[in-house]
Amino acid sequence: MNNTGVWDVVVIGSGPGGYAAAFRASDLGKRVLLIERDEKLGGVCLNRGCIPSKALLHIVKIVNEAQHLSKVGVSFGDPKFDVKKIRNHKNKIISQLNGGISQLAKARKVSVLSGKASFVTNSEILVETKEGDEKIKFKNCIIASGSSSSMLPNVPK
């Protein structure tokens, strides 16, 4: 990425808060760089947290509702779960939403950089990318690093 010049706004983190801030700043005419440590936009919420959980919970809800229909005279056999298909369904939802965020970033002319950001000064950050380190200068920075996923105790990995 050619990072000559100074960015008006750098946003660290591309979760719901980060990409919304980046898009709004761009809509207001700012030159915006969105930095995400993962390869895909969306942060923990989209890639490993809220959205995957909701996709799986939706399946459970449908199965539960189908089982309760027997009370009103509609019966189904015992459910059979194809874990591979369920995983593919979840991954498809994530992929579609990742693509949507990427398209919105492109349409709004928000530049995206994959890497881990750390502050060098109050107007410069260092981004560790797969291609090497990049120094980024900015006027304003929004830290939207969000959350990190955690494992529940006593639940096997």
Enumerate the predicted regions with their spans.
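Glycine-rich flavin
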Residues: 2-7, 23-30, 36-157
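Residues forming the Rossmann-fold NAD(P)(H) cofactor-binding site
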Residues: 19
